A protein has these predicted regions:
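Sec-dependent signal peptide recognition
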Residues: 2-9
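Extended rod-forming repeat segments used as scaffolds/tethers
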Residues: 9-10, 88
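N-terminal signal peptide c-region/cleavage motif recognized by signal peptidases
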Residues: 13-18
Length: 298
């Protein structure tokens, strides 16, 4: 009996040591980053796909069930998920992932956001008081977040600190090399005049040195009217653009209309993992984004 007891005790101790951190990611980019940094010490789940608008998700029972079992919540923050995440946290009853707990990680807490409104006026559309939250379009910002996320994993799973540190060092080296390659490949894109559908590309624009000529949405998050689009056509006669960009999850109707009226190229960029069939991980996401922009800028 004593041998059986000791055997069971050793078994459960072994299971505890090998236990994985259960990560609930709000968006695919954070699930992918968690996998890069956590390796076989984590299990991951993404609440959204690359073809969903993360602003508008329902806190459905299946998501609540997943969040109940999470050890770590990895989300964008800065009000991106404000329409559903607070309800999810509350319904989960999981103290580990409540705001302020070590198990709640918001990526935008670790970078400097732009686009902070001078005044809050909801009549001006879907604006974010904390600033533009779409930081995953910049590999520079993503690396900063990665370092912070690695430190959080080490805090939560101190028995495996050396493992997470090694994963971070490896990722940092590969990511810096890839970022340099992307910048070299995209050199010809500097100054490229573009039209965007929504202000979710600002960090990509800053990183690549693109020139934003116009935005299809007169008010953020509000689909452009025919009058809005006609005003864009008039504007483009004075300041021409070469490409109109929308995210893969967005309707292409407005971009298609503008292309038909003006003849400028249009492109759907993946925006995140799974935005198209080529963007299967973080590295391929930026590979494909650069490739698409170069192709449409010719």
């Amino acid at each position: 009996m004593k041998q059986l007891f000791m055997g069971l005790l050793l078994f459960f101790i072994s299971m505890a040591v090998q236990a994985e951190i259960n990560i609930f990611a709000c968006e695919p980019e954070w699930e992918a980053l968690s996998q890069e940094l956590g390796g076989d010490k984590v299990t991951t789940y993404s609440a959204t796909t690359g073809l969903q608008d993360p602003h508008y998700i329902q806190a459905r029972p299946s998501l609540i069930a997943k969040s109940r079992r999470a050890d770590l919540l990895v989300c964008t923050g800065a009000e991106l998920e404000t329409g559903w995440l607070p309800l999810l946290q509350r319904k989960s009853g999981n103290r580990a992932i409540q705001n302020g707990a070590p198990g709640a990680f918001m990526a935008t807490d670790y970078v400097q956001l732009t686009g902070i409104p001078s005044q809050l006026d909801r009549s001006q559309g879907h604006i974010h008081a904390a600033g533009n939250p779409h930081i995953q379009t910049s590999p520079i910002m993503l690396l900063t977040v990665a370092k912070a996320l690695s430190e959080r994993l080490q805090q939560l799973d101190q028995n495996n600190q050396a493992y997470y540190q090694q994963r971070w060092t490896d990722f940092e080296q590969r990511w810096q090399a890839a970022t340099l390659r992307w910048q070299q490949q995209a050199e010809s894109l500097k100054g490229l005049p573009i039209v965007i559908q929504h202000n979710n590309w600002d960090y990509l624009i800053d990183w690549l040195g693109l020139e934003k000529v116009a935005t299809l949405e007169a008010k953020p998050g509000v689909p452009p009217t025919v009058n809005d689009l006609n005003n864009i056509v008039k504007q483009l006669k004075l300041t021409p653009a070469k490409v109109v960009i929308h995210a893969a999850y967005q309707s292409p109707r407005a971009s298609r209309w503008l292309t038909e009226k003006t003849g400028i190229a249009k492109v759907a960029l993946p925006f995140t993992i799974g935005g198209n069939t080529s963007s299967t991980d973080l590295f391929k996401l930026f590979d494909n984004t650069i490739e698409l922009l170069l192709d449409k800028s010719k």
